[in-house]
Amino acid sequence: MRKTFFSKISFMLIAILLMWLKTYAVYKTSFHIKIDNLTQEFILFINPLSFLLLIFGLSLFLKGKNRNRYIIAMSCLVTFVLLANMVFYRFYNDFLTIPVLFQTSNMGDLGSSIGTLLEPTDLLLAVDIAVLIWLHIRQKAFQSDIPSTKNERAAYFLFVASVYFFNLGLSEAERPQLLTRSFDREMLVKNISLFNFHIYDGVLQSKQSAQRALADSNSLTEIENYVTANAKDANKRLFGAAKGRNVILVSLESTQSFVINEKLNGEEITPFLNDFIKQSYNFNNVYHQTGQGKTSDSEFIVDNSLYPLGRGAVFFTNAGNQYMAAPEILKNSGYYSAVLHANNKSFWNRDLMYDSFGYDSFFDINSYDVTDENSVGWGLKDKEFFEQSSELMKNLPQPFYSRLITLTNHFPFDLDEEDQLIDEYDSNSQTLNKYFPTVRYQDEALKRFIEKLKEDGLYDNSVIVLYGDHYGISENHNEAMGQFLGKEITPFEEVQLQKVPLVIHIPGITDKKPQTIETVGGQIDIRPTLMNLLGIDTKDQIQFGNDLLSDEKLDFTVLRDGSFITDQVVYTDGACYDKETGKPLEETKQCEAFADKAKQELSLSDEIIYGDLLRFYDQKRLDNSSKRKEKQMLDQAS
């Protein structure tokens, strides 16, 4: 008796159903996907179906046992994709992208972080696979070796296409121009599924890879015009206030502003920093702007005054580009440049990217004495790191531009008992609980570092810049964070938690006349601010930041996810909030006035990176200079 089509595909349908339900369960339990109405919930529920129907449906072209084996193999592969995204999301609050997958040189260093992020319940992801294997081996009813016909396959894939276009049409009606919002990965996953997002991400990757080949010097014109029109005059009174001094940048790992001037159980969390900012320029309204590249993104932003990419890390995707980074600019003023970081040189592709930035030296893990006794978590403890770095810095040619990158205050925030100077917090989040002791330890290490600079004679002739690189506590811990701060963590408050410390200390100047600067800004403004203090004119440079000390600086900054902040409003997740009250605004005109600027800045910066446009900049300046001289000669002749 001829078997019906449904009996032929019964094993496949069971696999699709199990994977569909599993994916929806992962959506609801592992990802924080905001749902506003029943339509969005329905879209979230059905969106995995078209992909699963397609990928499992390819088994219809196979015969016999190979069909079931393919289905089981695909179940394993799709499950791995789910698990990889779950683990990545637990720390980064984001979904994997293709550029992130190329960061394989980072994997060996993740060690304890990945172990901490895995949970026993993750084993439940294998239940459906076990069921399929059992059915394949034990149940003959699911071992059909009768091939499907051409008509059956045609009807099946026509149904798959109809499901896909129904999903896409519903999503477009709910969120118009959905596929133009490539920066909003949560929105894409919510509407087209995690799996279709990865396919879309692959298309984007191919498109962006072609941008460099198609770019030419004319591509820079719009960018130059925008940068020139939006550049603000620097603070003339402070221009050159730190001229000729050494620059010591300290990247404070995972340090957010909420710990500054805050206490835990009656004890200050950052006693040294609390005192240090009273002798410095303290910028209390500055936000980190990093994307998936985290610490490497912060380095990129600070050195280049460009935005990081929305997908992956620039340090991996575009390390071979030509840049106009701070080390290269300062080289013209006689500066020697160096990075000091007790980690592997290949981590975040730093060895290659630092060459592109123009750094003279990179002191990596091989420059340090690292032992089991002086290490914890991700590597060398901060106190040891600063102690050994000070010795290395004494031998640098002066003036120098240096960056020191700390490690101890890194997830999962491990700390030896003898280094614990403050008790852990008590909440349901072990991550937040352990965060405070590592921040306190980092603060103590900073105190010792400043003392060492004074002992070594490097303090008086330096400008010291301390900045937080990115968040340490993700929104996965908002319940515990709300408990600590004593308020609900709304989307507005979540943006406020992206504030990071920025402290500029100039001995002999800021200690005599300290300031608290409340101008809204981001890490992108650090380079222009620093260059002005050093007396370096950057009018000819392409940069999106402005001097934070300037009275003309616009109170505005945009985060990599498209959120933006002004002195009046905060925009995030499609909603506009009053900056003072944190309440949503019914009238969104105040946000609309800045929305285009936010999108344009991110887009233009992306064009520079993907097109490697700065390779044309020096030649373009020479061409423009020649044209000006030619015009002057013609004017004189006439």
Swiss-Prot record:
Keywords: Cell membrane, Manganese, Membrane, Metal-binding, Secreted, Transmembrane, Transmembrane helix
Residues in the Cytoplasmic compartment per record: 1-4, 63-70, 138-153
Membrane-crossing segments per the record: 5-25, 42-62, 71-91, 117-137, 154-174
Keyword Repressor: no
PTM text: Proteolytically cleaved.
Any one Gene Ontology molecular-function term assigned to this protein's record: transferase activity
GO cellular component: extracellular region; membrane; plasma membrane
Residue numbers on the Extracellular membrane side: 26-41, 92-116, 175-638
Keyword Mitochondrion: no
Primary location: membrane
Annotated substrate binding sites: 410
Topological category with respect to the lipid bilayer: Multi-pass membrane protein
Amino acids binding Mn(2+): 253, 295, 469-470
Site (Cleavage): residue numbering on this chain: 215-216
Subcellular location(s) per record: Cell membrane
Superkingdom per UniProt: Bacteria
Residue positions of the active site: 295
Pfam families given in the database record: Sulfatase
Family as reported in the entry's similarity comment: Belongs to the LTA synthase family.
Additional remark text: Although its sequence similarity with the glycerol phosphate lipoteichoic acid synthase LtaS, it cannot restore staphylococcal growth and LTA synthesis after ltaS depletion.
Protein name: Lipoteichoic acid synthase-like YqgS
Lineage of the species this protein comes from: Bacteria, Bacillati, Bacillota, Bacilli, Bacillales
Gene from which this protein is expressed: yqgS
